Amino acid sequence: YGGAMAYGESASAGNAVAEYEAYRTNTSRKEFNGNAYLEWEPLKDLKLNVSYALRYYNQFSKSIQNVVNQMNFQTNSIARTMPDTGDIISNSNNEGHKTLFQGRITYEKEIFKGHHISAMFNAAEEYWFQRNMGAGRKNRLHNSLEELDAASKEVQTNDGKSESEGLRSFI
């Protein structure tokens, strides 16, 4: 791939094809959004309402760094090797969900023509959960190999975290 090709051009001139070949990421994502709702009127003027919502996602990414030499065609030499960090491959997984459960009781009555009295009670609970995991290795055995096990075990990293949070409210 070309780098500096014109007289006086910087050796670190950008090359879009080289950037694409050097840093590649493949991502697959699965996601679900669902809602359920029920409303019931057991007595006249009294309504019960229950709803539930769920959002779930799972995303897997594979990042690959290929070593690419950019040539200076005027001097027939390598102008720049990228990335300068070497042959790295990494995998990451991001998974989580959010739930919302809500219940409501409503009473509304017309006591005189044009005059209403109403009361409402609402309870809601939300919950969020997220987990991230990642692993990386350096020094792939060959540029055509894209699996994590296709790299040396000498230089490897692992990381991850999980977090959750909830909220409960009454009105």
Predicted ranges, named:
Residues 1-18, 66-85, 131-160:
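Surface-exposed loop/turn segments flanking beta-strands in extracellular/periplasmic regions
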Residues 16-63, 88-112, 116-118, 130-132, ...:
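Outer-membrane beta-barrel transmembrane strands
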Residues 122-124:
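N-terminal glycine-rich FAD/FM-binding segment characteristic of electron-transfer flavoproteins
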Residues 126-128:
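Conserved "boundary/linchpin" sites in short secondary-structure elements
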